[in-house]
UniProtKB/Swiss-Prot annotation:
Annotated gene: rpsE
InterPro entries: Ribosomal_Su5_D2-typ_SF (IPR020568), Ribosomal_uS5 (IPR000851), Ribosomal_uS5_bac-type (IPR005712), Ribosomal_uS5_C (IPR005324), Ribosomal_uS5_N (IPR013810), Ribosomal_uS5_N_CS (IPR018192), Ribsml_uS5_D2-typ_fold_subgr (IPR014721)
Keywords, in A-Z order: Ribonucleoprotein, Ribosomal protein, RNA-binding, rRNA-binding
Biological process per Gene Ontology, one example term: translation
Name recorded for this polypeptide: Small ribosomal subunit protein uS5
Xref: Gene3D superfamilies: 3.30.160.20, 3.30.230.10
Homology family: Belongs to the universal ribosomal protein uS5 family.
Lineage, broadest ranks: Bacteria, Pseudomonadati, Pseudomonadota, Gammaproteobacteria, Pseudomonadales
Organism: Ectopseudomonas mendocina (strain ymp)
Residue span(s) of domain S5 DRBM: 12-75
């Protein structure tokens, strides 16, 4: 498991979550290929993830970064934390994320931490249950962040004021 921080000119924070080597056995021996899982974000609520496959590690990482930039979503944050507690699942991975007070930091492990860091969340309590496969944890985290809505957006959809909703 690797963990890199890189800044690009576009202002995106890129993190490498996982590199995995797989082997295909053929008549002449084994063919090794690599898969990379990366997350990309601007630190202000835009975040994306991608997977890339190649015979070389750098090429797999590059493909994953490009896929992550194409697969970006906007997350409605409440300052530096989440709007409300979120439960989400993908496959056998289940994640729970809850807003935290200022100064708490990111209390999350592994793949979930990488997603929350690049999304711009600075105060959160998070826990992963079930499978801790990084691919499924990232998917579950994204599902949860994608479903989260701010009170302003809910009020606008219902045609009411924020005070009526809260």
């Amino acid at each position: 498991m690797a963990n890199n921080d890189q800044k690009r000119d576009e202002g995106y924070i890129e993190k490498l979550v996982q590199v995995n080597r797989v082997a295909k056995t053929v008549k002449g021996g084994r063919i090794f290929t690599f898969t990379a899982l990366t997350v990309v974000g601007d630190g202000k609520g835009r975040v994306g993830f991608g997977r890339g496959k190649s015979r070389e590690v750098p090429a797999a990482i590059q493909k994953a970064m490009e896929a992550a930039r194409r697969n970006m979503i906007q997350v409605d944050l409440n300052g530096t934390t989440l709007q409300y507690p979120i439960k989400s699942a993908h496959g056998a991975s289940k994640v729970y994320m809850q807003p935290a007070s200022e100064g708490t930091g990111i209390i999350a492990g592994g793949a979930m931490r990488a997603v929350l860091e690049v999304a711009g969340v600075q105060n959160v309590l998070a826990k992963c249950y079930g499978s801790t496969n990084p691919v499924n944890v990232v998917h579950a985290t994204f599902k949860g962040l994608k479903t989260m809505q701010s009170p302003e957006s809910v009020a606008a959809k219902r045609g009411k004021s924020v005070e009526e909703i809260l």
